[in-house]
Amino acid sequence: MIGRLRGTLAEKQPPHLIIDVNGVGYELEVPMTTLYRLPKVGETVTVHTHLVVREDAHLLYGFHEKRERELFRELIRLNGVGPKLALALMSGLEADELVRCVQAQDTSALVRVPGVGKKTAERLLVELKDRFKAWETSPAMFTLVSDGPVPVSGASTAEADAVSALVSLGYKPQEASKAVSAIKDKAGLSSEELIRRSLKGMITK
């Protein structure tokens, strides 16, 4: 089992990364909440990982915090929730927001995540409620993402990457394009910031 990786961030193509560890490139898929916190390509990065072994592939998922990985593991234990849906849930909602939804049995935010209808949201909340009783939503447990922009050059490429990342989460291409286009003052923003603002707009609308 690979539990953690520390190396050089070699590539970043949301929602995938490649981390170079002593000459070996590990490809990972990460939730957008982890992507927002990553350093620039070429810098050192540490991620906590979860390995999924399948007949045709070994898939590695990465997380900025251990407790994000714990949340991911809780989600994929549920019936009908695979890694893709778990990442979509964690990308659309901050970890503490998701825990609060479970504790309050609030489906309003969950149903805006691709692949989650009302019945599915209700079932997930019921199944997770007992598991999350001991979880507290506090800054000590989750490091929240800043609302500040992350500027970068090459806005057109950043926008294309943002749309591609949203589609990979399950949003329709038209929905993804519309969400990115709706962002005001987006010139110079990084793909990560465009994704963050797009998801925030779609989940909270």
Curated annotation (Swiss-Prot):
UniProt cross-references to Pfam families, sorted A to Z: HHH_5 (PF14520), RuvA_C (PF07499), RuvA_N (PF01330)
Keywords linked to the UniProt accession: Cytoplasm, DNA damage, DNA recombination, DNA repair, DNA-binding
GO molecular function, one term: four-way junction DNA binding
Flexible linker: annotated span: 144-153
Stated name of the protein: Holliday junction branch migration complex subunit RuvA
Subunit structure: Homotetramer. Forms an RuvA(8)-RuvB(12)-Holliday junction (HJ) complex. HJ DNA is sandwiched between 2 RuvA tetramers; dsDNA enters through RuvA and exits via RuvB. An RuvB hexamer assembles on each DNA strand where it exits the tetramer. Each RuvB hexamer is contacted by two RuvA subunits (via domain III) on 2 adjacent RuvB subunits; this complex drives branch migration. In the full resolvosome a probable DNA-RuvA(4)-RuvB(12)-RuvC(2) complex forms which resolves the HJ.
Region Domain II, annotated ranges: 65-143
Domain notes: Has three domains with a flexible linker between the domains II and III and assumes an 'L' shape. Domain III is highly mobile and contacts RuvB.
Gene Ontology cellular-component terms listed: cytoplasm; Holliday junction helicase complex; Holliday junction resolvase complex
Nucleotide-binding is among the record's keywords: no
